[in-house]
Amino acid sequence: MSVILVSAGYDHTIRFWEALTGVCSRTIQHSDSQVNRLEITNDKKLLATAGHQNVRLYDIRTTNPNPVASFEGHRGNVTSVSFQQDNRWMVTSSEDGTIKVWDVRSPSIPRNYKHNAPVNEVVIHPNQGELISCDRDGNIRIWDLGENQCTHQLTPEDDTSLQSLSMASDGSMLAAANTKGNCYVWEMPNHTDASHLKPVTKFRAHSTYITRILLSSDVKHLATCSADHTARVWSIDDDFKLETTLDGHQRWVWDCAFSADSAYLVTASSDHYVRLWDLSTREIVRQYGGHHKGAVCVALNDV
């Protein structure tokens, strides 16, 4: 499998797609809840699904419909999942107000970190020693895994839920987005840790709710998804100027993923469709249809 493209959502199914043809090649039933987020390990062996109160791992290389591991312990929807570099541990966030760090090989008692509000996303710093999370009260927290505590907190906008965070692959930048349509960007001048966040810009990306913010792997583009039925791509090198508005979904756009070369974007929407866009032409290259309810998460690995 050179290209792995997966989507999931409210119809309790996980769907694998042939990216070029648009054919659904495999469907996994996720019967007990919707799927909120998807994450593929960088070795392309495992798919993580974040559902209601649990995270499950599926073997990508077989047709086994059953999870190879299940991680129970959250008391609410799991809102994000992220793998450490060599996939030995993973971190999850939840509406129950906690972040949990799990040993992938033994789904036993995780390490816990607590927010005072539902946690919408957690990401791992490239140094693998810090976590950065955001919550519904509008707080960003930085957690030092060595010190086992929160070392920094900032609140860009009081009482405005921060829905999504994205960390640059080289540790140089952090981006966050909220329910008012605002994006915040910070530089991390020393790249090696998150101790010094230098504000770069704040801009209005959408007139309403932003559901996802994502930095491309080459740190040249920033994508935002919104309740306004669009996804937008912004140029980092050109002072976050709007590059492209992807217009075509009929309902909320919930999630997106860049291709490895940052030339394409995949989006997932409440209109049941997943779409592959050519960012240079704004055209829909492929539409993936098969979900019976909203598609709210997507994962792509084409490295």
Curated annotation (Swiss-Prot):
Listed name of the protein: Target of rapamycin complex subunit LST8
Name a GO molecular-function annotation.
protein serine/threonine kinase activator activity
Q: Which SMART domains match?
A: WD40
The protein's role, per its UniProt record: Essential component of both TORC1 and TORC2. TORC1 regulates multiple cellular processes to control cell growth in response to environmental signals. Nutrient limitation and environmental stress signals cause inactivation of TORC1. Active TORC1 positively controls ribosome biogenesis via control of rRNA, ribosomal protein and tRNA gene expression, and rRNA processing.
Which controlled-vocabulary keywords does the entry list? Cell membrane, Membrane, Repeat, Vacuole, WD repeat
Query: Which superkingdom does the taxonomy of this entry point to?
Result: Eukaryota
According to its UniProt record, which protein family does this protein belong to? Belongs to the WD repeat LST8 family.
| Species whose genome carries this gene | Saccharomyces cerevisiae (strain ATCC 204508 / S288c)
Spans through the membrane: none
GO cellular component term, pick one: endosome membrane
